[in-house]
UniProtKB/Swiss-Prot annotation:
It is found in: Membrane; Cell membrane. It is a multi-pass membrane protein. Keywords: Cell membrane, Developmental protein, G-protein coupled receptor, Glycoprotein, Membrane, Receptor, Transducer, Transmembrane, Transmembrane helix, Wnt signaling pathway. This is Frizzled-8. One of its GO terms (molecular function) is G protein-coupled receptor activity. The gene is FZD8. Residues 1-26, 91-113, 182-209 are extracellular. GO terms for biological process: system development; Wnt signaling pathway.
């Protein structure tokens, strides 16, 4: 009976899990999704940093441009190192819902280490720079108003930056919340799936609306 119960799980694993030694197309899909996804998050942090340097620290364009090579190095090197680490650890697996190759779909440790933790760090760091920049702009706005000068242009800039912040931070926060929901409940889902008690109405099940929301974001 035990062997019969394991056969479906092994069959599912064969269809879901693809490691670095698997099809080359799976590896390419993983690199396209994971590498560029993480790179885009780092570029957002860099954009937030440069805006803080310009608005809060009064750096000029030339001073910021002098660090461009370091920004490019960070934006491309960090995702490269993480992608290589995933491939070296044979941690590429398949998403059973979306049907793409990614990391962390079969291992909570990989989900937390390679996906959830970096996204949280990037969102927190970028938001911190944006908040510091807004505080500096509000101070500048107060000083300008006290001098009797109009602040229309500055306020328009603040509105644009605010819209940009919302358009990124809200979807990023939703994606992180979906990953937290998944990593918090996945063990219970797997235990319920492996339990031979099909008539249990209270068996925990994943809410697929949460997964669809994550993919939409």
């Amino acid at each position: 009976a035990g062997a019969a119960e394991l056969q479906p799980e092994l069959a599912v694993a064969e269809h879901v899990r693809y490691e670095s030694t698997g099809p080359a197309l799976c590896t390419v899909v993983f690199l396209l999704v994971y590498f560029f996804g993480m790179a885009s998050s780092i570029w957002w942090v860099i954009l937030s940093l440069t805006w803080f340097l310009a608005a809060g620290m009064k750096w000029g364009n030339e001073a910021i441009a002098g660090y461009a090579q370091y920004f490019h190095l960070a934006a491309w090197l960090l995702p490269s190192v993480k992608s290589i680490a995933v491939l070296a650890l044979s941690s590429v697996d398949g998403d059973p819902v979306a049907g793409i190759c990614y990391v962390g779909n079969q291992s909570l440790e990989n989900l937390r280490g390679f996906v959830l933790a970096p996204l949280v760090v990037y969102l927190f760091t970028g938001s911190l720079f944006l908040l510091a920049g807004f505080v500096s702009l509000f101070r500048i706005r107060s000083v300008i108003k006290q001098g009797g000068t109009k602040t229309d242009k500055l306020e328009k800039l603040m509105i644009r930056i605010g819209i940009f912040t919302v358009l990124y931070t809200v979807p990023a926060t939703i994606v992180i919340a979906c990953y937290i929901y998944e990593q918090h409940n996945r063990e219970a889902w797997e235990q319920a799936q492996n339990c031979s008690c099909p008539g249990d109405p209270h068996r925990p099940k994943p809410d697929y609306a949460v997964f669809m929301l994550k993919y939409f974001m």
